[in-house]
A protein has these predicted regions:
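N-terminal pre-catalytic segment of deacetylase/amide-hydrolase enzymes
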Residues: 2-90, 96-109, 225-226, 260, ...
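Active-site beta->alpha N-cap acidic-glycine motif
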Residues: 59-174, 178-179, 260, 267, ...
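Catalytic domains of cell-wall/extracellular-matrix polysaccharide-remodeling enzymes
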Residues: 124-125, 145-269, 274, 281-287
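A near-ubiquitous, low-amplitude feature marking generic local secondary-structure context
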Residues: 23, 75, 86, 90, ...
């Protein structure tokens, strides 16, 4: 066999091997391409998108739930079926007295509950009214014994204040069998109640509410429509605490106040200890 034929056969053999490798490479590229196409198609399919959406929704729900638990004692709006609930807490100070029954009648006719911050002496003198209030689902809050500014605030400490509220608490407990812990300071909590004073109130086991809307009803005997105007001008937030009093003019305008608040999309609630939120002028989270 001459050298030329050997070289020729060797060259042809190398070409065949090279072509074989190229063919195998092309086959592998085709297989990879088919796999990528199938994967992309699957990712773009409805089932995969639904799964991705579900994962995201689960994450969002968990995130919102975590935020909700952290803000439970704050003034965050309550949610119902994914919508913000607008809630008004009607509160009445200084009773019970001759006008309290009128207020209770109106609220009963409207199927709404409120919160009554009572003076201990008035509660002692009107036990049947206190019983009715409690039995009809209203919260029996406390408003001191005397409402005396000098006695409550000018003694140099919290002692007189706390003793008056403890006495009022005992009176309501004796009448209803329930020991209320929510109080409202006469004349409001600021500026007369400082940080240490507030700490003493919290240590005595009380929570304290001021208000977000002042109806100034005490200023308008004979002019109840002015009370409605005050409420209308101040009703802006999703949660409002309205300050009123057990007065004749308040009873005269209460139905119109209720009608207006409802027309703005609000519901009514009484205070519930297990749904407490901060509503004091200093935003003290202890109270």
């Amino acid at each position: 066999m001459d050298g030329h034929n050997v070289v020729s056969r060797s060259s042809r053999h190398r070409k065949k091997r090279r072509m074989g490798r190229i063919f195998m490479l092309l086959v592998m590229l085709i297989i990879v391409g088919v796999g990528v196409y199938a994967g992309v198609k699957m990712l773009l399919s409805g089932d995969s998108l639904a799964s991705a959406s579900t994962i995201r929704e689960d994450f969002v729900v968990t995130e919102v739930a975590a935020m909700g638990s952290a803000a439970k004692d704050k003034t965050a709006p309550t949610l119902y079926n994914g919508m913000k609930r607008k809630v008004v807490y009607l509160t009445f100070d200084d009773g019970p007295n001759a006008h309290t029954s009128e207020l209770l009648d109106i609220m009963k006719n409207n199927d709404i509950k409120g919160t009554f911050f009572m003076l201990g002496e008035n509660a002692k003198n009107n036990p049947d009214m206190v019983k009715r209030m409690y039995e009809e689902g209203h919260y029996p809050g406390l408003h001191s014994m005397t409402h005396d500014y000098s006695k409550l605030y000018k003694s140099g400490g919290s002692k007189n204040f706390i003793e008056e509220f403890q006495e009022a608490q005992s009176i309501v407990n004796d009448i209803t069998g329930y020991k209320p812990t929510l109080i409202r300071a006469p004349y409001g909590s600021a500026p007369q109640i400082g940080e240490e004073f507030r700490g003493d109130i919290a240590n005595a086991g009380f929570k304290m509410w001021d208000w977000t809307i002042d109806s100034y009803d005490w200023k308008y005997p004979g002019n109840p429509s002015a009370i409605l105007s005050q409420v209308q001008s101040q009703l802006t937030e999703d949660t409002e605490v309205v300050l009123m009093h057990d007065r004749e003019q308040t009873a005269q305008i209460l139905q119109q106040v209720i009608d207006y608040i409802r027309s703005q999309g609000y519901e009514f609630e009484a205070y519930h200890p297990d749904q407490h939120f901060i509503c004091n002028f200093r935003h003290d989270e202890r109270l």
